[in-house]
UniProtKB/Swiss-Prot annotation:
Protein name, UniProt field: Large ribosomal subunit protein mL51
Oligomeric and partner information: Component of the mitochondrial ribosome large subunit (39S) which comprises a 16S rRNA and about 50 distinct proteins.
Subcellular location: Mitochondrion
UniProt keyword annotations, A-Z: Mitochondrion, Ribonucleoprotein, Ribosomal protein, Transit peptide
Transit peptide location: 1-31
Length: 124
């Protein structure tokens, strides 16, 4: 029994861990060289426009809201909500102008999400 205990202690000291199970070999990771830094373009359009509309209220007499400056689909601008709410908003805003197949796929997704939200989740 003492032989087993001695082997166990040496194995623990060798790997410097106190696990009761083996995770494979205990070879340490060696870094032979410092990784090279990535070349990052700091003046891409996205990075250069970051924070442009932060002071729109202070500098512009609070006439424009930052959500009015956002470029994108009408039903997404300044909107926070889940996928079902976003799709319902899209259907209400542009549903009558959608192509037949797109509207059909949208309606299928909405009905699927209705079923999912009504069967699962916190608020049932």
């Amino acid at each position: 029994m003492s032989v087993f205990g001695g082997l166990w202690r040496s194995a623990v000291n060798l790997c410097q861990s106190s696990r009761l199970f083996s995770t494979g070999s205990c070879a340490r990771i060696r870094m032979h060289a410092i990784p090279k830094l990535k070349e990052v373009d700091r003046w891409t359009e996205k990075r250069s426009m970051f924070g442009v509309y932060d002071n729109i209220g202070i500098l512009g007499d609070f006439k424009a809201h930052p959500k009015d400056m956002i470029r994108g689909p009408v039903w997404v601008r300044g909107f926070r909500g889940n996928e079902l709410q976003r799709l319902l908003r899209k259907r209400n805003m542009v549903g009558d102008r959608m192509m037949t197949e797109d509207r059909h796929n949208l309606q299928k997704r909405i009905s699927h999400l209705y079923r999912r939200f009504n069967r699962h989740g916190k608020h049932r």
